[in-house]
Amino acid sequence: MSKTISFRRDDELASAPPSMLRRVIPTRLRRTFDLPSHRLRQAILPRKFLSRRAGRATAVSASDGHRPTLYIDLAIISSHDAGTGIQRVVRALALAIARRASGNWEVRFVSAKRTRQYHVIDWPKAAGQGSVDPIRAKPGDVFLGLDYSLDTLRWHRGQLKRFRRDGGSLWFLVHDLLPSQRPDWFSPNTVLRHRIWLDMLAALADGFLCNSAQTEADLLAEMDEYGLPRRDYRTSVLPMGHDINQARHEDAPRDAASLDRIAALAAEPFFLKVGTLEPRKGHLDLIRAFDSLWARGLDQKLVFIGRLGWRVDALHDAILAHAEFGRRLIWLDDVDDAGLIEALRLCEGVIVASHAEGFGLPLIEALGHGKPVLARDIPVFRVQENLGVHYFPADATPETLADDIQRWRDAIRAGAVAVRSPLVGWDESTEELFKAITGNRRL
């Protein structure tokens, strides 16, 4: 039989070793990785016994005159920029931070490999340039996990723990919690890596930047499952910019072949769907709806721009075997940012059919380019209703969706669809980012 552990006073609990604390934490709060000692105490001890490292670091920084350094994680995008929506966000924010950096902070981009710890890189210049030394924190420094670095956090957990012990704080950008919420939409490997990534965040993070109020609510619910009191970490909703041009390197080469493929679409009107091909994005729903529209005699192209994702064998086969593939059903799987901008310029409208999103960057990018948007009626898309977005029912059948597309198309051509551009750009996003991680101190 297991021995029951009890504590007569809170101070006895506060001084208990981690191995004993793990025996009293509720089983439902345990995850793949045990919480480290400081998080265990935050989960189960009264507040009067806890001190916040971030507060101490800020006080030291203010008193000794040290100019803090912001280390920005670009471990994925610096080695392989696949051009996804998440990577456009990472690139846009990183470039905006570099543009707006002033004398209050040192800004350094960092990367890591399996066998090499986080170190400074000279991004966006050629990979491999930069420092060979691992980064170390001074009090008041901040590590910002801007990139979606699922594996590098696990590989270099010890380095990040030391960064925090040395007086630095750790912040992370969270795009969505979908692999945890809907594992059936993702590969088992992605689900496992995402779960371990969440374990790392629960163990290490001082704060989180979320791309929407929905993502923030989902994250808070996840952290509650770890038993972490909400007073012991911070969250902030970061408004997203919309201008794809601001997410491009100034010297980024243009893919002439990509632009030629896009230009060829201009001969006939088309609707555009942007995003990685994956189950939740609604590509099959659109194909079935357009089958109905084409059967009615509607001569309108449907264009997909996005790379092949996961668990999409049926979708992949449906596209390639479709009678209209290459004619009225077009799939472009390798389009750079310049090509995407041109596609948005030429299209008649953008359809956002995702069943779930953390934010929905293609929607806001389309509005930023003045294009009408028809979106699935889910809460995260309703936030943009005042900008002129039209909606179709979340559970629409192919016929219902076809009807909504046809009505929307007729309204566009009648001049009855008014679109307003979003007000927030990437520079404004960066200002809010710095207010969140520094307590309203300016970049």
What are the functions of these language-model segments?
Residues S2-L443:
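Carbohydrate transferase catalytic cores enriched for Leloir-type hexosyltransferases
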